[in-house]
C-alpha cells in the first residue's frame, strides 16, 4: 500500500512539472509608424451649412428634396506619403430614413424632413459607416485638397410641417 502511494505521488508531481513546462510561449508584437496624414483647415473644423428658406409646399411627396447647398472640407499640409482619404459623416439617423440626419428636436422644429449629405458626384453619403462603399479620394501631397459635398432637405413623409431645421454631424477621416 505504501509503495502504491509513492508511485501515485510520483505520477502527480510528474504531471505538475509537465504542465508547468508546457506554458512557455513567445508573443511577437509589430507595427508601423506612419506619417501624420493631413491637417483639417481651420475653416473646415466647425462650420454651418445654411439650407436657406424653403416652403413646405416644395415637398409634395415623400422623397422630395430642396436645392442642394454646397460645402467643402479643406485638408492642408498633407504629408508626402499620404495618397488618399475616406470621409465618414456621423450623426443621429432619421427614424423614417436612416440615410438622413435626424432634425434636432425642439418646440419650433419642422417635421417630415431629414437632411441628406451628398458627395462630389451628388450621390447620398451613408451615415455612420466609414467603409460602406466609400471610395478613396486621391490627395495631392503638400497642397490644399478640397473635398466637395452638398446638403439638402429631403421629405420623409407626405406631409411636411414648417419650422426650424437643425441637425449636427461630425466627420471622420481615414488616410491612406
From Swiss-Prot:
Keywords: Disulfide bond, Fimbrium, Signal. SUPFAM superfamilies: Bacterial adhesins. It is found in: Fimbrium. The keyword Nucleotidyltransferase does not apply. It comes from the Bacteria. Gene3D superfamilies: Fimbrial-type adhesion domain. Belongs to the fimbrial protein family. This is Uncharacterized fimbrial-like protein YdeS. It comes from Escherichia coli (strain K12).
